[in-house]
């Protein structure tokens, strides 16, 4: 079993990812979806989160990612960014979706300087907007951002386009297609439901259960 498959199985086992083809979930965007991902659950499982961090470190090494500061997206990316930074003995920051309206009105928490190279850490990639917003905020402060890592990606066409437009590489530990295959193998869904899920993945805006 390869790493992407192991991560997919982990997410299904702890119910971080749930599938419901008959009563789909509605996202805040209004889109209906047969899949819902809540990777925040991982932090409650010490052994599972260790697996995730080890997988992240292997991904970083395999892809020769170069950076000197780890940037978590608020809030779900923060714990994973902290654990990665701790293992690599690197500075860590986190980036809000927008600046606070009180105090120092910071969007970026932690110390940064121009010329640094930041790695964005996200828990989930749907359209990629939160990760890319973090990358843009850092670039505006003179920080170089070329890569983002995430636990899971829905592999939506919009996300692929958004990352390409921003000239940021997105690396995920596991992906939608791998998870759907694992869901069939483990008996979470059948072949008919698998085809419906794949149809959603290709065109989520027009998908119907």
Curated annotation (Swiss-Prot):
Pathway in which this enzyme or protein is active: Pyrimidine metabolism; UMP biosynthesis via de novo pathway; UMP from orotate: step 1/2
* Positions with a binding annotation for orotate: 126
Name the Gene Ontology molecular function terms of this record. magnesium ion binding; orotate phosphoribosyltransferase activity
Q: Which cofactor does it need?
A: Mg(2+)
Tell me the PROSITE patterns matching this sequence. Answer: PUR_PYR_PR_TRANSFER
Share an example GO biological-process annotation for this protein: UMP biosynthetic process
| A Pfam family reported for this protein in Swiss-Prot or TrEMBL | Pribosyltran
Q: Where does 5-phospho-alpha-D-ribose 1-diphosphate bind?
A: 96, 100, 102, 122-130
Key words of the record = Glycosyltransferase, Magnesium, Pyrimidine biosynthesis, Transferase
Signal sequence annotation:
none
* UniProt keyword Magnesium, yes or no: yes
Q: What is its EC number?
A: 2.4.2.10
Q: Which Gene3D superfamilies match?
A: 3.40.50.2020
Group of enzyme by EC: transferase
CDD domains, per database record: PRTases_typeI (cd06223)
SUPFAM superfamilies according to UniProt: PRTase-like
The UniProt family comment states:
Belongs to the purine/pyrimidine phosphoribosyltransferase family. PyrE subfamily.
Q: How does it assemble?
A: Homodimer.
Per the entry, what this protein does is: Catalyzes the transfer of a ribosyl phosphate group from 5-phosphoribose 1-diphosphate to orotate, leading to the formation of orotidine monophosphate (OMP).
Q: Which HAMAP family match?
A: PyrE
The name under which this protein is listed is Orotate phosphoribosyltransferase
Name its species.
Answer: Coxiella burnetii (strain RSA 493 / Nine Mile phase I)
- Gene designation: pyrE
